[in-house]
């Protein structure tokens, strides 16, 4: 089902935002991503209305890749989508490889990670600098993005990948 006519067009839902069609973008070699095969978004738990559930089902998703931590997805579980296989692989990892948890209980761990980063560089750092360092490493050696590419290479489409807000972890996957 073709739902958008321009690359990155937002698909409107009553309960969720930043849900986008990724068809239409051009690759470096000039080829174009096909419409109706690749979607990105935020927390699906916000989809409450029958209209939202019907719209999501109309995309014909075969795969949903949840990039949130176990804590985030347990606190706000995805709704079942008919015909779609669900898998969760956290899109952000701590230095030791464990899941970076953005739920309430994970915030203290994030503070500890930042302090460890400050010790490693020998000075206090601004949050922007710390997150920039995380984002530079995020796409590499990350099981979440390996899972996304495996779905695409296996032609398990249409696929939706998402996190809590559909910006950071999801944005890296969209690049």
Which residues does each PLM region occupy?
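Ser/Thr-glycine-rich phosphate-binding loops at phosphate-binding pockets of nucleotides
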Residues: 165, 169-170
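Cys-dependent protein tyrosine phosphatase-like superfamily
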Residues: 1-160, 173-175
